[in-house]
Amino acid sequence: MARVKRGVTTHARHKKVLKASKGFFGRSSTNYRIALERLEKSLQYAYRDRRVKKRDFRALWIQRINAAVREHGMTYSVFINGLKKAEIDMDRKVLAAIAFDDAAAFAEIVKKVQGALAA
């Protein structure tokens, strides 16, 4: 049976890791062993932050809606309660976009919410 030498596969694996770790600081981009550790950690951060990103954007939308609603003398929680009573089915992403881009349209939504709360 012939002897199996793994130089080609090892080189390919090292090359793949070093290519993926390009742009890392210091030896993290040039030394295979350190690059492998940094690359694994970077993938962990990426996995975690794909989930955190969703939370962060939701928090941003809520802050934008809250700021816009307070200009009309209302709080965020009261506004969301009024939306449900008025049966306006818009998510926070859309509401934040309207509040940010089109103040007049958002003012109309607030009027409908105030009407639903008064009733």
Swiss-Prot record:
Does the keyword Protein transport belong to this entry?
A: no
Recall the GO molecular function terms of this protein's record: rRNA binding; structural constituent of ribosome
Is GTP-binding found in the keyword set? no
PROSITE patterns cross-referenced by the UniProt entry: RIBOSOMAL_L20
Domain of life, per the record?
Bacteria
**Gene3D superfamilies membership:** 6.10.160.10, Ribosomal protein L20
Any single GO BP term:
ribosomal large subunit assembly
Q: Where is the signal peptide?
A: none
Which keywords appear in this protein's UniProt record, sorted alphabetically? Answer: Ribonucleoprotein, Ribosomal protein, RNA-binding, rRNA-binding
| Stored InterPro entries | Ribosomal_bL20, RIBOSOMAL_L20_CS, Ribosomal_protein_bL20_C
Membrane-spanning parts: none
Q: Which GO terms describe its cellular component?
A: ribonucleoprotein complex; ribosome
User: What PANTHER family does the database record attribute to this sequence?
Assistant: 39S RIBOSOMAL PROTEIN L20 (PTHR10986)
Sequence similarity: Belongs to the bacterial ribosomal protein bL20 family.
What is the documented function of this protein?
Binds directly to 23S ribosomal RNA and is necessary for the in vitro assembly process of the 50S ribosomal subunit. It is not involved in the protein synthesizing functions of that subunit.
Q: What is this protein called?
A: Large ribosomal subunit protein bL20
